[in-house]
Amino acid sequence: MRVLLAPMEGVLDSLVRELLTEVNDYDLCITEFVRVVDQLLPVKVFHRICPELQNASRTPSGTLVRVQLLGQFPQWLAENAARAVELGSWGVDLNCGCPSKTVNGSGGGATLLKDPELIYQGAKAMREAVPAHLPVSVKVRLGWDSGEKKFEIADAVQQAGATELVVHGRTKEQGYRAEHIDWQAIGEIRQRLNIPVIANGEIWDWQSAQQCMAISGCDAVMIGRGALNIPNLSRVVKYNEPRMPWPEVVALLQKYTRLEKQGDTGLYHVARIKQWLSYLRKEYDEATELFQHVRVLNNSPDIARAIQAIDIDKLR
């Protein structure tokens, strides 16, 4: 099976990709989105979102990375897709699933689900702009407020010439509510298409991955939030390995505090460490205590000192 690391805006950036791919076996990472409006973006924008472009589109541990674009205008999606692959991206991905109100208000992300023709035109323009040997993928949800257009959306992606389709098994309006996940609908799309379909949504452990694949018939999954809950989730999902022990999680957090974010004004680790701990609390009781300890800290050096001060040997 293939396991992909999902794009998560404001969460899974290049530093987190570096950490997670070092302790996992991901087949591919998709970047946070590059927002495309009405211009060809400068090279520095692509390098900021995807510094791996300067390493043959791979993380330091060797996992492939693909740039994701978000926008609605085919011409500019095409030009920026061409630039992404010229800079070394291993193909490009089109975001048609982001449920953010800000993103949707500007006509991008899940808004495209309302009009599958827009998805077709955007994906087709990107496909024509990218050399045939490089993949063009599209990430969608089942629809905006219902799944009525799910087949029309899927057909648009395939007819546009996309290489593969990632389907998040909920509508935009359903957000991330667990009770609404519909792996069966993903399976219906998979049966309809000739291109590979990758299942996404509510994959938290080996059991849920097996259930998702059994119901959908997909042999590839994309994981997002779960990858933060259990830092070695791809190995759990692929090989039924146990979750990472807490001392190893702390060691990973310590390494995270030593990584420098370009352009950081001293607040990056404050937000990101607290954010990651809020995910870890769902799986590790120890993360709750650590979160309470650092939640009052408001600058990166203090956060780093607090995390670095933990004696891992005493946790074993």
From Swiss-Prot:
InterPro entries membership: Aldolase_TIM (IPR013785), DUS-like_FMN-bd (IPR035587), DUS_fam (IPR001269), DusC (IPR032886), DusC_C (IPR042270), tRNA_hU_synthase_CS (IPR018517)
Chain's role: Catalyzes the synthesis of 5,6-dihydrouridine (D), a modified base found in the D-loop of most tRNAs, via the reduction of the C5-C6 double bond in target uridines. Specifically modifies U16 in tRNAs.
Site positions (Interacts with tRNA): 35, 95, 176, 272, 274, 279, 295
Active-site residues (renumbered): 98 (proton donor)
EC numbers for this chain: 1.3.1.-
One protein family per Pfam: Dus
Amino-acid positions noted as binding FMN in the UniProt annotation, renumbered to this chain: 7-9, 68, 139, 200-202, 224-225
Gene Ontology molecular function: flavin adenine dinucleotide binding; FMN binding; tRNA binding; tRNA-dihydrouridine16 synthase activity
CDD domains from the UniProt entry: DUS_like_FMN
Cofactors that this protein relies on: FMN
Family: Belongs to the Dus family. DusC subfamily.
Keywords noted in UniProt: Flavoprotein, FMN, NADP, Oxidoreductase, RNA-binding, tRNA processing, tRNA-binding
Name of the protein in question: tRNA-dihydrouridine(16) synthase
Reactions listed under catalytic activity: 5,6-dihydrouridine(16) in tRNA + NADP(+) = uridine(16) in tRNA + NADPH + H(+); 5,6-dihydrouridine(16) in tRNA + NAD(+) = uridine(16) in tRNA + NADH + H(+)
Gene from which this protein is expressed: dusC
